[in-house]
From Swiss-Prot:
<dbReference type="InterPro" id="IPR050857">
    <property type="entry name" value="D-2-hydroxyacid_DH"/>
</dbReference>
<dbReference type="GO" id="GO:0051287">
    <property type="term" value="F:NAD binding"/>
</dbReference>
<feature type="binding site">
    <location>
        <begin position="234"/>
        <end position="236"/>
    </location>
    <ligand>
        <name>NAD(+)</name>
    </ligand>
</feature>
<keyword id="KW-0560">Oxidoreductase</keyword>
<dbReference type="InterPro" id="IPR036291">
    <property type="entry name" value="NAD(P)-bd_dom_sf"/>
</dbReference>
<protein>
    <recommendedName>
        <fullName>Putative 2-hydroxyacid dehydrogenase SH0752</fullName>
        <ecNumber>1.1.1.-</ecNumber>
    </recommendedName>
</protein>
<comment type="similarity">
    <text>Belongs to the D-isomer specific 2-hydroxyacid dehydrogenase family.</text>
</comment>
<feature type="binding site">
    <location>
        <begin position="283"/>
        <end position="286"/>
    </location>
    <ligand>
        <name>NAD(+)</name>
    </ligand>
</feature>
<feature type="active site">
    <location>
        <position position="265"/>
    </location>
</feature>
<dbReference type="Pfam" id="PF02826">
    <property type="entry name" value="2-Hacid_dh_C"/>
</dbReference>
<dbReference type="GO" id="GO:0016616">
    <property type="term" value="F:oxidoreductase activity, acting on the CH-OH group of donors, NAD or NADP as acceptor"/>
</dbReference>
<feature type="active site">
    <location>
        <position position="236"/>
    </location>
</feature>
<keyword id="KW-0520">NAD</keyword>
<feature type="binding site">
    <location>
        <position position="260"/>
    </location>
    <ligand>
        <name>NAD(+)</name>
    </ligand>
</feature>
<dbReference type="Pfam" id="PF00389">
    <property type="entry name" value="2-Hacid_dh"/>
</dbReference>
<dbReference type="InterPro" id="IPR006140">
    <property type="entry name" value="D-isomer_DH_NAD-bd"/>
</dbReference>
<dbReference type="InterPro" id="IPR006139">
    <property type="entry name" value="D-isomer_2_OHA_DH_cat_dom"/>
</dbReference>
């Protein structure tokens, strides 16, 4: 019986599917699996279920002589050396679409949280209390009728746009390609990055990471933004130079920021935690029961297909 190694606990629905077909070994230690344990686990495995926080590099891949598939539990896959896996004739898969609704909801939740100062207000109410309603007390910004600029109009970005439409927002987007069908569907307008930054009240990053996008948002980009603008990153941390972000916030170049992903994740750049106009969450974009269960089904089904001689559905390194 072929062995499947899982680099961290996944929901039972996918785990049980795998156990019906294969010998399954799962890392159940605390925290992220260390490299030595990972290499020991995969050395005789036909499949690896990798977690987004697990680095699957050349050394790990070389330690697994029987490996046929790396099924990455996450929509992203920049934690896996996909090119080297292809050289070794190993399929790498991911879990797209399962994260769409959950991450779009979280993105828009961050928009509302930072604009209406919800987290800040919760903290105040719990610690100091307040004297009651007053005309100038604790004002934030309305979202309705404003302009949202979406960096990356993929599945998640499009879902964010649909939610923005319900708030009567004007929708700008940028990316490598204009998507005219999406424009008609959701009423979005394609612009270049600088135009988006200059005009958007809320800038959401929903793009997947690649090296070309590293520090796409840096010192010069913050200078283009409105002083009342908010930056929301629910895509990938390294797209933003967080040192430049902290300075932009401290210098009041922008109004605020909300982050679910970080440049040096899981570390959070010094300065972000101490700023009241920043909302930070621990990478929970798709952390819903529904999304995580669906993701476990996807990695299980693609693993089953591959080890049964079929083509997995979501290969990212064809």
């Amino acid at each position: 019986m072929e062995k499947v190694y899982i680099a961290g606990a996944i929901p039972e629905v996918g785990l049980n599917l795998l156990k019906e077909h294969f010998e399954v070994e799962m890392y159940e230690g605390e925290g992220i699996i260390d490299k030595a344990t990972l290499m020991e686990g995969v050395k005789d495995a036909s499949a690896l279920i990798s977690i987004l926080s697990t680095n699957v590099d050349q050394e790990v891949i070389d330690s697994a002589s029987n490996l046929k598939i790396i099924a990455n539990y996450g929509a992203g896959f920049n934690n896996v050396d996909v090119k080297y896996a292809r050289e070794k004739d190993i399929d790498v898969t991911n879990t797209p679409k399962a994260s769409t609704a959950s991450t779009a909801e979280l993105t828009f939740g961050l928009v509302l949280a930072v604009a209406r100062r919800i987290v800040e207000g919760d903290k105040l109410s719990r610690t100091q209390g307040f004297d009651g309603w007053a005309p100038l007390f604790f004002r934030g910004r309305e979202v309705s009728g404003k302009t949202i600029g979406i960096i990356g109009l993929g599945e998640i970005g499009s879902a964010v746009a649909k939610r923005a439409k319900a708030f009567d927002m004007d929708i700008l987007y940028t990316g490598p390609h204009q998507k005219k069908e999406k424009e008609r569907e959701i009423g979005a307008k394609y612009v270049d990055l600088n135009t988006l930054l200059e005009n958007a009240d809320f800038i959401t990053i929903n793009a997947a990471y690649n090296p070309d996008l590293h520090h796409m948002i840096d010192t010069e980009q913050f200078k283009l933004m409105k002083s009342t603008a908010y930056l929301i990153n629910a895509g990938r941390g390294p797209i933003v130079n967080e040192e430049a972000l902290v300075k932009a916030l401290e210098d009041k170049q922008i109004e605020g920021a909300a982050l679910d992903v970080y440049e040096f994740e899981p570390e959070i750049t010094e300065g972000l935690k101490s700023l009241d106009n920043v909302v930070i969450t621990p990478h929970i974009g798709n952390a819903t029961y529904e999304a995580r269960d669906m993701m476990s089904k996807i990695v299980a089904n693609d693993t089953i297909k591959k080890l049964n001689g079929e083509t997995p559905q979501f290969i990212v390194n064809k």
